[in-house]
Amino acid sequence: MQITMKQARVGAKMTQQQVADKLGVHVQTYQRMEQNPQDVTIKQGKEFSEIVGYNFEDVFFGIESN
């Protein structure tokens, strides 16, 4: 099941500012990440997945994990 970064963030009941703070980036940088997830590095993607509690593969590759 593929979900977007926004869906994962909202599912975690977090604001863009909260996620940006945890990733150590400016909120505008995080907003660009949500709009262009193909530009997110693997490291950022894995950190994001840990923060919001969703599997990296589900968010960035649309692969359902077991």
Question: What residues fall within each predicted segment?
Answer:
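Short basic helix-loop element that most often maps to the first helix and adjoining turn
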Residues: 3-22
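Short, charged recognition helix plus adjacent turn
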Residues: 8-13, 39, 50, 58-66
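Short coil turns linking two alpha-helices in DNA-binding domains
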Residues: 15, 26-29, 55
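Acidic-residue sensor for enzyme active/binding pockets
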Residues: 16, 34, 57
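Recognition helix of helix-turn-helix/homeodomain-like DNA-binding domains
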Residues: 25-39
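Alpha-helical DNA-recognition elements
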Residues: 32, 36, 47, 65
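Long, hydrophobic alpha-helical segments
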Residues: 42-45
